[in-house]
Amino acid sequence: AGGAAGGAVVDSAALDAFAAKVTGADGVLASTAKFVLNQLGVVAPVAEETADENTAVVAAVEAELGADWPKQVEPRFDERKAILFDDRWASAREDLARAYYNNDESALNGSFIGLGKTIADEAAWYAGKSDNANLKIAFNRVAAEAGENASESAENSRFAGDIAVVTGVAPNSIAAQVVNGLLAGGATVVATSHSFKPSVKAWAKQTYREHAAGDAKLWLVPANLSSYRDVDALVAWVGNVQKKTSGATTTILKPAYEPSLFFPFAAPPVHGNLADSGELFESQARLMLWGVERAIAGLAKIGADTDVQHKLHVVLPGSPNRGIFGGDGAYGEVKSAFDAIVNRARAEKVWSSRVTFAHPKIGWVRGTGLMGGNDPLVEVVERHGLKTYSAAEIAVELLNLSTRES
């Protein structure tokens, strides 16, 4: 009986839980106080991140990814800087006049195929006026080309209706040669450039002038595809209509495109051996591999709700070089990983149901950023039976893997 007089024992855990409900950070008293402050228009102060915390984050980024990592992934894409080349008929008239008045046959080296009756008639007129026999022949050739129906030519319409995205273009590169072939086949091409230098813009203008056939168009846009933000921005820009509204007038600057071809050629200078693995290899793989995967998934998703049968054909630029040269950074690992991309497409239908692949193993290409340093050895290796390619030659092979028939 005496023991019973001592009263019940209180469970300390239950007491702590009760106290938390009343006086804890999310308890009744705190919630009531926040409600009253909000009703009075008073915002409770938020603790600012301390300088020490910011310093720790910066130090961690520098240690793991390198001091220049923020610059490496800084977005460059800007839809306002996109340049469209689609006025071949206008530059064709300039070429005709330049050839005639300067007596310059080379001004007619560009493409005039399918430009229509106006250009054909103008070329014929110059042919009748010219006293230069060779120039007269050239004008007549232009008149015949302009009068052709590009859609009736297998060569000049092989990519008609295709929307091709080509990343990493630079003059004299494989990507540039691929763009040339796509334009010659009548495609609409979206080409990305990291540098967006005047020399790249001049190349784009000239390559359109020399190669565009039929209704071919060329967009040149700046993009840093080491930046996932830029990858996403590029995908969104490609897949959405771009408009400009002035008062009551709305102008379509770019229609929404549904890409059918993707050539991921964006790549950094690759260097470094296994001992350099870390931030250097990670930055290279980010651009050549992970950004490519993200772009494939994003581009393939465009139009999925409205065109369920559409396919994105991806030409992955593979390589037999899986580390056999050495000193080329993450290049070998990335090219090995391309095998995995193709393999996982068979298992991951959530994205691959709208994607097809060509995965050629590109061999020795002369004059490129990767192999150009070995050009003095070309004569010797070819003498021993090893075939090398120019950028234009390998582009032909890649484009042959990109037609509807392939």
Where are these regions (language model features)?
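Glycine-rich phosphate-binding loop and adjoining beta1-alpha1-beta2 segment
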Residues: 195-213
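C-terminal helical subdomain
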Residues: 1-9, 14-24, 28-49, 53-106, ...
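Canonical Rossmann dinucleotide-binding motif of NAD(H)/NADP(H)-dependent dehydrogenases/reductases
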Residues: 150-192, 196
